[in-house]
Amino acid sequence: MNEPASAGKITAHSVVGQTRPMPIAKVLTVSDGVIAGTREDRSGDVAEEVLTGAGFDVVERAVVADGADSVAEALRALTGGFAGLVVTTGGTGFGPRDLTPEGTRAVVERDAPGLAEAMRLASPLGRLSRQLAGTVGEALVLNLPGSSGGVHECLGAVLDVVPHALDLLAGGRPH
């Protein structure tokens, strides 16, 4: 008997016939322009679309102004008691107010350099990114660039391993 076409599809919550609970995610946009109402939150929208398309349930979105302190405060609120993925968009470049990595570093307990490296290698301009990846309790935090294309490229580079990372953070077995 033929299985439905979706039966073999690998999503963020199914691997080799084993079903996992749907992973959850939060999106934090870091942008003075979005806060001021002079820019639309396109990168946050793209992050939500990509995550939802990969099988994540995006349970919260927030926007903060650029700056290390605002990012750190928001990340503490978003990761406190949370088991899931938190992505930031924006503030990872060389601009004077691009301080998302500094705010992230103040909160992250353990670095995940392989994820950050994979995201940087996803595009030639990624080499200009200062993005970080790391964990806070059972939350995985990924810094993404502020461009819509960069969000697509970076998430595309790591989403295949994020569910496994979340399982490990929740106490799952490595293999």
PLM segments and residue spans:
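Non-catalytic beta/alpha edge segments that cap or flank active sites
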Residues: 1-175
